[in-house]
Structures are given as structure tokens and as C-alpha cells.
Amino acid sequence: MRNPTWEDAEEIGLALFEKFPGQDPLQVRFTDLRRWVTELDGFSGDPAASTEGTLEAIQMAWWEEWKS
């Protein structure tokens, strides 16, 4: 299995849900979200390559896990 990058929103969303199960993803600032993603074990994306769109996709994937 390869290490996740910014394009792997579903995988990252699940990892964030597992790491922060009580955190409402919609209450997380993008600056914190970006840092938390880059600190995930195995994350191999370029920290400078994140965009608002990729962070939104990750946040929504995390929210889908959190709300269910």
C-alpha cells in the first residue's frame, strides 16, 4: 500500500476520524487541518501542495465518517 497524498481524501478522512473521533470536522480551521494531515503517519504529500479544494475534500470525507 502506498503512502497517502493530498489526492487521497477518503483515506485521509478515515485516518483523521480514527485519530480524532470526537472532533467535529466542520469546526476545524484549514490551518489546523493542513497541519494534522501532514502529521499523519505515512503521509507523503508535499506540505506546500495543499489547496483549499483538497482540504475541503478531506474535510468532507472526514465529516462523512464522523456523522455516521
Regions from the language model: what does each represent?
Residues 1-68:
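A charge-rich, low-complexity, intrinsically flexible signal that marks solvent-exposed coils, linkers
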